[in-house]
Each structure stands twice: as structure tokens, then as C-alpha cells.
Amino acid sequence: LSYSAFSRDGLIKQLEFEKFPEADAIYAVDHITVDWNEQAAKKAKDYLDTTSFSRDGLIKQLKFEKFTQAQAEYGVSKVGL
């Protein structure tokens, strides 16, 4: 999470992709301390570093990445959109 930003569900899917059993992935994600709002802000910044988005477009992209509506709105606001 220091290198790449993830939503909770996105991180679970990434761990499953890396061949961790679903139950283990869920357990791991539920037992770490993560500010999901800050992860959304980090992911929003990553997107804006490579392309341009409208506020609504970036919120939709973050929701596609499995951030909640509130997390997506926080992230987009944090980067100034």
C-alpha cells in the first residue's frame, strides 16, 4: 500500500490474483490498519499524474476500482477536483 493504492475490495482481489485463498485475503485485509480515504486520494493522484479527468469521471473511475462513493469523493476532493 506504500507503492500502489488499493480499495479494500481491490486489495482482496489483488491478493486472490496472487493465489492467496479468498478467506486468507479477507482476513489479511481486515487485520491491517489502512485509511481507505487516503488510499482513494493516492489512487486519484496516480490517475491525474498520467491523464486528465473531470471530477465526475474520476469518481466513476475510483468506484470502478471498488472504492465506496464516500471514499471516491474524498479522494477526488483531496486532489483538488
Model-derived features with residue positions:
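An alpha-helical, amphipathic repeat domain used for nucleic-acid recognition
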Residues: L1-L81
